[in-house]
Amino acid sequence: MEENMEEGQTQKGCFECCIKCLGGIPYASLIATILLYAGVALFCGCGHEALSGTVNILQTYFELARTAGDTLDVFTMIDIFKYVIYGIAAAFFVYGILLMVEGFFTTGAIKDLYGDFKITTCGRCVSAWFIMLTYLFMLAWLGVTAFTSLPVYMYFNVWTICRNTTLVEGANLCLDLRQFGIVTIGEEKKICTASENFLRMCESTELNMTFHLFIVALAGAGAAVIAMVHYLMVLSANWAYVKDACRMQKYEDIKSKEEQELHDIHSTRSKERLNAYT
């Protein structure tokens, strides 16, 4: 009988421990982190492959070659964008971990408001710093989303020209890279519907794949923006809770101090009355 009672108490203790651990998880920050990682993964992975597909399309169908020397051409710009993608992936992987850690500490501070946990001034400054940094990153991701929409628009135009060529017989349409700013005005790199390269490009799966990769990358950038907005809401709410917790702690400290003073006064008066009586 005693063994069963001890076993039941042990199971109850484990269950309470699990409930306490689950209660300390910052679920809002966890959802935002998952959304951020998913968005960054889609943007970086699909964006990198879409840029590689763009290089192959330019070299294969437009017969565009790399410029010798240190001249800044479209291929050099694409390489720079790839390195930027590597940096974005690494930076936001670390930033997501930092925000999760901040969420755990803030949740612990709120849960242990009436315990021994003390919210320091440094912790409040870190929360405010994360709010400011997340807001700047949200603006940056808005810019990235707007910039990613440009290749989507370009590939949509190319896809439309290919579709119109197949639907309208005898249509004479040309695609000039100068109108997209890919080459300089002095260079003439265009293909028309009558050329073999244009027909091969429209029939290839590479064009369709690159177009859809850019669309997915755009969706990933949009998901990152939503994650940043979610983080801002979470951080702002945590900041408000922590601020109220600090005020509550000050109130409790003042109240305890006043009660102690009243107790000391009553004790002193009781001693004086006792001495006077004796």
UniProtKB/Swiss-Prot annotation:
One of the GO BP terms on file: stem cell differentiation
UniProt entry keywords in alphabetical sequence: Acetylation, Cell membrane, Cell projection, Disulfide bond, Glycoprotein, Lipoprotein, Membrane, Neurogenesis, Palmitate, Phosphoprotein, Synapse, Transmembrane, Transmembrane helix
N-acetylmethionine PTM positions: M1
Gene Ontology MF terms: calcium channel activity
Regions crossing the membrane: 23-43, 85-105, 128-148, 214-234
Modification(s) after translation: N-glycosylated. Palmitoylated by ZDHHC17/HIP14.
Keyword Lipoprotein included in the entry's annotation: yes
Coiled-coil annotated residue ranges, if any: none
Chain positions found as Phosphoserine: S256
Matches recorded under InterPro entries: Myelin_PLP (IPR001614), Myelin_PLP_CS (IPR018237)
Membrane disposition: Multi-pass membrane protein
Tissues where this protein is expressed: Widely expressed in the CNS. Found especially in the granule cell layer of the cerebellum but not in the molecular layer or white matter. Expressed in the immature embryonic retina including the nerve fiber layer (NFL), inner plexiform layer (IPL), and outer plexiform layer (OPL). Weakly expressed in processes of Mueller glia cells.
Keyword Hydrolase: no
Extracellular side: 44-84, 149-213
Family: Belongs to the myelin proteolipid protein family.
PANTHER family with a match to the protein in the record: MYELIN PROTEOLIPID, NEURONAL MEMBRANE GLYCOPROTEIN M6-A
Subunit description: Interacts with OPRM1. Interacts with palmitoyltransferase ZDHHC17/HIP14; the interaction leads to palmitoylation of GPM6A.
Protein name: Neuronal membrane glycoprotein M6-a
Organism: Mus musculus
Gene: Gpm6a
